[in-house]
Amino acid sequence: MIGLIQRVKSANVRVEQQIVGQIEQGLLVLLGVKQGDDQSKADKLLQKVLNYRVFADQQGKMNLNVQQAGGSLLIVSQFTLAADTQKGLRPSFSRGASPADAKALYDYFHQQAALHIHTETGQFAADMQVSLQNDGPVTFWLQV
């Protein structure tokens, strides 16, 4: 399971011109689900996302996690993160989970995150437009 996290000052996601998820300060989490991923991996990734120290403390060091910084999560499904780009000029998506399995884990990840922090989401498998104001920019690829 892959989480590409970006520290943001604000972010939103639109489907058919309508905002379906929006946060101010926090993390935009682009979530990719691979074959073989399960709830255990989702739990590990969520703990990493929640506890990764990417926000500045009073001394300006990245010492605070998203909860300590008073932030939120915007979780957006991103199946292309699981792409195999090793060969040729066209990505292969054979490593990605099936749509049904990916949706189940995406929903699980969101439900578990919402137990700990204010969480907004995109719409699974929709054509989405994601807008964000990067803070830094600070971007990390987390994989479990």
From Swiss-Prot:
Protein localization: Cytoplasm
Gene Ontology biological process terms from the UniProt entry: D-amino acid catabolic process
Keyword presence, tRNA-binding: yes
Cited InterPro entries: Daa-tRNA_deacyls_DTD, DTD-like_sf
GO cellular component: cytoplasm
GO MF annotations in UniProt: D-tyrosyl-tRNA(Tyr) deacylase activity; Gly-tRNA(Ala) deacylase activity; Ser(Gly)-tRNA(Ala) hydrolase activity; tRNA binding
Placement of sequence motif Gly-cisPro motif, important for rejection of L-amino acids: 136-137
Keywords carried by this UniProt record: Cytoplasm, Hydrolase, RNA-binding, tRNA-binding
Chief location category: cytoplasm
Function, in words: An aminoacyl-tRNA editing enzyme that deacylates mischarged D-aminoacyl-tRNAs. Also deacylates mischarged glycyl-tRNA(Ala), protecting cells against glycine mischarging by AlaRS. Acts via tRNA-based rather than protein-based catalysis; rejects L-amino acids rather than detecting D-amino acids in the active site. By recycling D-aminoacyl-tRNA to D-amino acids and free tRNA molecules, this enzyme counteracts the toxicity associated with the formation of D-aminoacyl-tRNA entities in vivo and helps enforce protein L-homochirality.
Subunit note: Homodimer.
Family: Belongs to the DTD family.
Domain remarks in the Swiss-Prot or TrEMBL record: A Gly-cisPro motif from one monomer fits into the active site of the other monomer to allow specific chiral rejection of L-amino acids.
Name of the protein: D-aminoacyl-tRNA deacylase
Source lineage: Bacteria, Pseudomonadati, Pseudomonadota, Gammaproteobacteria, Pasteurellales
Gene coding for it: dtd
